[in-house]
């Protein structure tokens, strides 16, 4: 099953691509339930329809606030499918009032996991925690990469302070479509003419603290990166 926000380009775009790929691979989508920004305060109807359809996995291409509502509602009704989301769900453990134990087994695709043991990630996490007192999620990592990729594009194309906005824009477009960038959210990243970035996704799953020999991104849960 799928629950998505039809009023949001991010959510509806992923839904459309997922639906096409599922059909190509012969996977059955037993139900696809939509909501909009105007009626997202109560998603019990969408959850109930997935449950009635017998969906064993529910794909959630949505943001963490709405995802927390769905997991809470499913728990109240005894519905226990596998929930799988995307990078917009990163941050669900920080939703005020959300019972984080409900995130056990939740899987999502995200370009960044704060538990990663590479030197670049750990240096960023340490500096971020020292500055802001909390663990960064993928939104923070994306913002970091935006700034430093732009910096690289500026250096490689020779942008100067005396250029006007349109000149700088054209230079940056040239830079992004011709360079390769190594950042927190991926290595060897490239951009096409439309601005779409190419990088490998990471699939992670929330594990209870102590359930695996893993560093914990945010107790009581760990981010366990799953191999592709």
Please state what every model-predicted region is:
Residues 1-228:
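Extracytosolic ligand-binding ectodomains
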